[in-house]
């Protein structure tokens, strides 16, 4: 069937900010979709609120709307653009729910727009728990016994029928949000209550426990001719009970019998047909009872999902790309395979390798959170590895996590473990925590049997045998300290790193590497080709293995290598992948062969056609150096970029240079200079710049002396970290001692850095480019919150709205002086604080920052592309002349009338609960906790801020009640904004002390009891919030460590029910402006292309006046 000719324009709904359960994989999927639609000659319209995505680059769509993904806003875009169709299946749950709302409110019918990729009936059948249960029954398959409920009374009645434990699954949520395992009535009240609230239809499925069953997924595609393919089978190593996003997974499924697989396949094909997905992909999850082989269907996603990205990277089959073509009317047999160029998409991929995905968690950011893994997803990222066998892939994936202790350790204890020790270790394997797989390996190493560990974990014995095989291989290595060739080859075939081998034979990693190279034991690089080498592969997508024959083809000119950022984590996310992708794209355009090294299956950078060659490898020195050597052997290497992927590649810079690898852009020496307190202070002194008083301490006595000299409060942090890891504001000596006692986990070989904390300062962020001579300031961002909240968690605005022109000039001059003094060649990010009109330098990061995408979108200048070209020898002057950078202005001299852009963050507190079941404290501080960001852009700040809040999931109310409870230090500054809220007609609710201050200033408020002071049936503020009687909260914390008192319980209640909460006076002021604007007029929607046109016109007008 040819492409539908009645479609001329398509609106794609993106997934919005990166959140747990819906992350970078939707940028990968969406970018593929946009490229397909453009190639087909369609007018492409995109709505996505996330500026850190590649898909929101203006070049990928004809009209790119960085606007809130709400039904109201998307309807405005439809009314303006009048698309023929909406494609909602590539933006995760956000896009699906928005599409359903547009159908329900009549907007699609009103404007004559159809859904493509999946229709409303198919979405409802796949997502509605009760409807899907009927689908499964009609297909002759089984679901787990279950009951649908819409209230707690119904849930309690269902519990008597199903019995405990049972699984709670809300409808229409993502990443298992609101789901869990209820072992008793208390659990049921807590989990089902949250689930009913999180489900947009207030619907929850209560399901019989199938804990301990084996869990599988099938990635399916179906076209309009009823051709169905199974793209990939995925098996969870963890049994049912741990969300698939938090489980170690493997592709293809390894422990299914052929009979079980065929049964599962038959069910999946019947289900996709019955649901009616006929122009796209879907994901179906199964559970198999290990003793009887009974198969039940768990759930279905009638859209491209998180697993689709993994399956695409695992197989080389671009699911999102093909799903988009199917939505346009093509059939699978009409779509060519990009990799082989000979087979159609109707050929199911065949794998001659094993893929393992391991999740990455961030519990260190939420120390109060319960680390138990359940059906609610908690991981913030993932790493993937490919090997010729399971053990090789598993070990490569584990070391790709880059976390201390993430790889297996095979050191045996000095004393042989006794029965009690073994029993204790086996007992630990029952705990479903992030340590589970390592606990399994330790128990087996100590002498536990596979049967014992299987009894404790329900992990399939085949996987346990493989882990036991690793322990046995470790013993072989231990018994051969001379490292004979057979031993080394065997170790490498099972994925042992040089560091692991060195640990076993008491040799340094470099010595092991020297022995290995002397024996010519090196990896070869195989190709992901979708067909198990049956046809030639035309896309060089490689993975390492200690096999015989390499498949890296010779190349004619030296390559440029870009090191990616590895698995997403808090502090290092999609923003860094953005810079890597831009560098690869612009360098290819400039005629270079580019090589990407990364291990993150979610990202655009690991798409097989972004770079000339892709190596899916861990970002360790050993693995990167082997790729370097492979490139050198087949055509040469110009150099390596380490400044684009965040802290991960930066940590490798010095070792790579020492090994003779040319580093492109900023040198390792300059990187170290910026981190070295003494050297950096010298640069600032020479430039006449000031820092907050500071010192460097190696022990508590030194730290105590420095803190007393500087004066409390002080900001304490380790060196060489990203995302404020381990950073804390300390108010007294006891807190300082507690911090240092715990800080060794953060960066053991580095001293603690101590700074005077500047209270009430305005924080300023700058992204700039320097070529050794000229500086281009990309943007100056003013933080909306005062200093003290990590820049990655703070809302900011560009251009700045309260900085005087002379401050902007001082910032610009300081930026250039620091870039020159440090010796930057490429990007630099600087943070300043303005206190009492004195400009202080907080820190300099000579690399791509997380704000580069935001600055690029806000100003229309591709900063990462410019940085890559500077790294290969171009100058700022040349880039201005070529139009890569503006010829007549930079981020400090933006034309008058430049739109205002606000960046707001998205926080994951609703995902994390304490062991008692309460939400963790949402109080922000100097350690970063946000997972993603959104952008609001408009002519004026007030509307841009309102858009950003709506996009982040916390739309501001225009009426209702405002609860106010502020610390003593904030009471004076809070009076005026609270008075203005009262004047707008908001009911003011406050606690006793705050109420008295407000009353003395002529502001009447309803007094509510503090939680600790409530008597009898008297409602507390937490009760009012939970009951929906509070619409906005203003709660500033007292100094010192936040007590688990009223403040915490107020914030926890607000997080649970999603009430917008302001914790600083400046944030309340911004909210006041936004609410006032919203009450006066409805905002317009404007595409980035229109904003850029306005910028060009304004710049031209100003240039002509000059």
Curated annotation (Swiss-Prot):
Binds 4 Mg(2+) or Mn(2+) ions per subunit. ATP 2 binds at residues 717, 756, 758, 763, 788-791, 831, 843. Residues 403-550 are annotated as: Oligomerization domain. Its EC number is 6.3.4.16, 6.3.5.5. Mn(2+) 3 binds at residues 831, 843. This is Carbamoyl phosphate synthase large chain. Mn(2+) 2 binds at residues 299, 301.
């Amino acid at each position: 069937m040819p492409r539908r000719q009645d479609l001329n324009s398509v609106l794609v709904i993106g997934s919005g900010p990166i959140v747990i359960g819906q992350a970078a994989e939707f940028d990968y999927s969406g970018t593929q979709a946009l490229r397909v639609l453009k190639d087909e000659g369609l007018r492409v319209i995109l709505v996505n609120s996330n500026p850190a995505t590649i898909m929101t680059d203006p070049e990928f769509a004809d009209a790119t709307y960085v606007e809130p993904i709400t039904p109201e806003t998307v309807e405005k875009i439809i009314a303006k653009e009048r698309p023929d169709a909406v494609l909602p299946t590539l933006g995760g749950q956000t896009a699906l729910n928005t599409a359903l709302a547009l159908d329900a409110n009549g907007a699609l019918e009103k404007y004559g727009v159809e859904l493509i990729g999946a229709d409303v009936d198919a979405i409802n059948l796949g997502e509605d728990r009760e409807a899907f249960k009927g689908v499964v029954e009609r297909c002759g398959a089984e679901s787990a016994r279950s009951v649908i409920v819409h209230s707690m009374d119904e849930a309690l009645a269902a519990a008597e029928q199903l019995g405990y434990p049972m699984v709670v699954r809300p409808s229409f949520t993502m990443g298992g949000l609101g789901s869990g395992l209820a072992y008793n009535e208390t659990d049921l009240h807590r989990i089902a209550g949250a689930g009913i609230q999180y489900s947009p239809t207030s619907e929850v499925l209560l399901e019989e426990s199938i804990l301990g069953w084996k869990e599988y997924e099938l990635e399916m595609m179906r076209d309009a001719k009823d051709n169905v393919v199974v793209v990939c089978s995925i098996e969870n190593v963890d049994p049912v009970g741990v969300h698939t996003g938090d489980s170690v997974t493997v592709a293809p499924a390894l422990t299914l019998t052929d009979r079980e697989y065929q049964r599962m396949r038959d069910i999946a094909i019947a289900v996709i047909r019955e649901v009616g997905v006929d122009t796209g992909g879907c994901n179906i999850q199964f559970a198999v009872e290990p003793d009887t082989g009974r198969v039940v269907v768990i759930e279905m996603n009638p859209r491209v999902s998180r697993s689709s990205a993994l399956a695409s990277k695992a197989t080389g089959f671009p699911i999102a790309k093909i799903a988009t073509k199917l939505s346009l009317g093509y059939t699978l047999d009409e779509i060519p395979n990009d990799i082989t160029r000979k087979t159609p998409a109707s050929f199911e991929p065949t794998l001659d390798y094993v893929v393992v995905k391991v999740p990455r968690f961030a519990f260190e950011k939420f120390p109060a959170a319960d680390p138990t893994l359940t059906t609610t997803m908690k991981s913030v990222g993932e790493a993937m590895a490919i090997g010729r066998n399971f053990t090789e892939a598993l070990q490569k994936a584990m070391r790709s996590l880059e976390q201390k202790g993430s790889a297996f350790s095979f050191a045996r204890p000095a004393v042989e473990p006794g029965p009690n020790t073994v029993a204790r270790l086996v007992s630990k394997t029952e705990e479903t925590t992030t340590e589970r797989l390592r606990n399994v390996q330790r128990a087996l190493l100590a002498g536990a049997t596979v049967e014992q560990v299987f009894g404790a974990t329900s992990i399939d014995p085949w996987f346990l045998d493989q882990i036991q095989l690793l322990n046995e291989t470790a013993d072989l290595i231990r018994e051969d300290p001379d490292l004979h060739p057979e031993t080394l080859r065997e170790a490498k075939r099972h994925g042992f790193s040089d560091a692991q081998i060195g640990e076993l034979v008491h040799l340094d990693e470099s010595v092991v590497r020297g022995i290995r190279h002397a024996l010519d034991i090196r990896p070869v690089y195989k190709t992901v080709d979708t067909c198990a080498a049956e046809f030639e592969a035309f896309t060089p997508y490689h993975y390492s293995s200690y096999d015989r024959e390499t498949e890296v083809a010779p190349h004619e000119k030296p390559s440029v290598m870009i090191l990616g950022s590895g698995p997403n984590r808090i502090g290092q996310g999609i923003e860094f992948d953005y810079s890597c992708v831009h560098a690869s794209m612009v360098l290819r355009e400039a005629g270079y062969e580019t090589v990407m090294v990364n291990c993150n299956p979610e990202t655009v950078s690991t798409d097989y056609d972004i770079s000339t060659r892709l190596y899916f490898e861990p970002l360790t020195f050993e693995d990167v150096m082997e790729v370097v050597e492979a490139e050198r052997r087949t055509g040469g290497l110009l150099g390596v970029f380490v400044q684009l992927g965040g802290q991960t590649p930066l940590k490798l810079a010095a070792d790579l240079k020492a090994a003779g690898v040319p580093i492109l852009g900023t040198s390792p020496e300059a990187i170290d200079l910026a981190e070295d307190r003494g050297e950096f202070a010298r640069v600032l002194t020479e430039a006449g710049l000031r820092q907050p008083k500071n010192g460097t301490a190696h022990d508590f006595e030194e730290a105590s002396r420095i803190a007393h000299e500087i004066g409390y409060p002080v900001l304490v942090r380790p060196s060489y970290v990203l995302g404020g890891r381990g950073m804390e504001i300390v108010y007294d000596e006891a807190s300082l001692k507690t911090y240092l006692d715990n800080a060794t986990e953060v960066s053991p070989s580095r001293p603690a850095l101590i700074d005077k904390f500047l209270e009430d300062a305005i924080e300023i962020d700058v992204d700039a480019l320097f070529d050794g001579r000229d500086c281009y300031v990309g943007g100056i961002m003013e933080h909306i919150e005062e200093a003290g909240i990590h820049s990655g968690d703070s809302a900011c605005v560009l251009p700045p709205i309260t900085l005087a022109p002379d401050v902007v000039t001082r910032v610009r001059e300081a930026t250039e002086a620091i870039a020159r003094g440090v010796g930057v060649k490429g990007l630099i990010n600087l943070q300043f604080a303005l206190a009492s009109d004195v400009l202080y330098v907080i820190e300099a990061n000579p690399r791509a920052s997380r704000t580069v995408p935001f600055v690029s979108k806000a100003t229309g200048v591709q900063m990462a592309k410019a940085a890559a070209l500077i790294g290969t020898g171009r100058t700022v002057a040349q880039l201005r002349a070529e139009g890569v950078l503006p010829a007549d202005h930079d981020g400090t001299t933006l034309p008058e009338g430049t739109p205002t852009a606000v960046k707001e963050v998205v926080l994951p507190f609703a995902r994390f609960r304490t062991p008692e079941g309460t939400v963790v404290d949402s109080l922000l501080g100097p350690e970063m906790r946000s997972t993603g960001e959104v952008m609001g852009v408009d002519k004026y700040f007030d509307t841009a801020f309102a858009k950003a809040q709506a996009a982040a999931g916390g739309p501001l109310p225009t009426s209702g009640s405002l609860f106010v409870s502020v610390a003593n230090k904030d009471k004076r500054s809070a009076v005026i904004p609270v008075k203005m809220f009262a004047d707008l007609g908001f009911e003011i609710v406050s606690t006793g002390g705050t109420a008295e201050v407000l009353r003395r200033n002529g502001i009447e408020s309803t007094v509510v009891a503090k939680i600790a002071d409530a008597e009898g049936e008297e409602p507390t503020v937490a009760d009012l919030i939970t009951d929906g009687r509070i619409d906005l909260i203003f709660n500033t914390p007292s100094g010192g460590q936040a007590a688990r008192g009223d403040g915490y319980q107020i914030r926890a209640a607000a997080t649970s029910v999603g009430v917008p909460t302001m914790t600083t006076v400046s944030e309340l002021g911004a909210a006041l402006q936004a609410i006032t604007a919203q009450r006066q007029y409805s905002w317009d929607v404007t595409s980035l292309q229109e904003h850029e046109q306005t910028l060009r016109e304004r710049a031209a007008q100003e240039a002509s006046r000059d």
